[in-house]
Amino acid sequence: MESSVVPDHCRRFALSDSKCSDYLEACNHIHDGACDRCCLTERSIHEIEDSLPLVAATSEELDGLKFNTEQARRNINAWKAHLLRAVNQDEARINVIERLDDNSVFLVQDWAMKVLPRKYRESQSDWFEKRGLPWHITVAVRRRSDQQLESMTFVHLFKTCSQDSNTVLGIMADVLTKLKIGMPNLDSVFYRQDNAGCYHCASTIVGAKVLADKAGVSLKRMDFSDPQGKKGACDRKAATIKSHMQIFLNAGNDIETAAQMKTAIESSGGVPGVTVTLSEIPERQTKNAVSWEGVSFLNNLEYESECLRVWDAYNMGPGKIVSWSRFDAPTIEEELSSIVDLENERNMHLPFVALKPRTLTSVSETASSDGGSDHGSASDFGSSSSELFSCPEEGCVMTY
């Protein structure tokens, strides 16, 4: 929770940096409370430690048990701290979505796990020495004038590429160009990424501002999720696309190249709200990385005309001011690479699809709707997607 009398439950107190006033958020209450469940956990660990001499046969075994117990305590405390940070960082995503309108777009970026080339029929020897095909996913979210949220996905496929800031900036430029063509009224952009080095570096942070100015849009924010902070929009969309490709493979086709992968994604009418680009990124001759000491500790950035305002935890304190004058913007712009669209596609139409809220039905509601009957009709069973189970066997698309 944002405010609590328990010290490590209060986000303002736990995530503030007492050594830096820029990252310090004041609380209006005293932290003199205690959590009964947290105390129970600590008490249980103490009881385990007290019982170790009773179960250890030798001193070496006792030392090993003590070490394992101490490691378990540290892991539990680290996990608890991670949950607090993850909730706080997710607040940035929620607030950005609430601010969206029909002139702004929220972009979530991530590299999907490489796809291994596969044949419809392949021998065991064909399985070895494969090189995965890299692909990048960008999910764009906007809010229509009637307050309905819409999303679309940009997929960039590569034969081979380095997953570095140079490639990411090329993808950013391509996405902004396509969005500006399809949405002439676009004026604001928000970014959210994970903590991969290709995103969480000075070159990407500063280069994104240069690209936005070049595209004629205003870059408002860039936020980073907490490491291992659950699945995001890109992971969910990647799972849908992989399932679609599996159907194409089961139909007797091969997926061994980036071009065949594009054909698989676009087969059978394609995946709703997904546009695919067969891409190539030219190698730069010079790679002068932008230097910014301590950038890996910054998780939230707000772009202003004269400066950057940065935080190490979302909304904790007024933030630290970083002037644009410390970066050499002309040099950065000269070194930016552009994505080469191998099929030279520039669609004016952006396939945005409406986002439908998920509704969860409790067990009690389900039981009451059945009217106490043990046997429902076949039509009732088929009408609920929550009662469908997919076959776990690879290659099977049956549901039960």
Stretches found by the model and what they are:
Residues 1-398:
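Extended mixed-charge, aromatic/glycine-enriched low-complexity segments
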